[in-house]
Amino acid sequence: MAVCEASAADCLYRSAVAKTGNLVNVTGDLQTIMAGLACGEGNMIGWDILKNHVDVFASCPDWMSAKATRIYANPLGDDPHVVSGESGSVPLGFCFTALHDEDAKRLKKKR
């Protein structure tokens, strides 16, 4: 399972990287097109579950979400048209980048 967050408010990602088991809050300018993800503070109950079960915590820039929003809106072949805002598109943007970006090759390694 992957948790994808806006890089401007990536509290869960920073908490995972810190490896202390505690939540790290993000403050300051939380400006992002992913408005629904711009809170900067995690929930302790959720964090207690996520920190032990998530495979990847991803800090995602706005372009990743914008690209996925366009992919959803312009499906290929028989794929369905999906209407999604930027907060809902970011997981697809992360997956697309992991599969197609040479710099993200390490994300494809199997455990």
Regions found by a protein language model. Give the residues of each.
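PLP-dependent amino-acid enzyme catalytic core
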Residues: 1-111
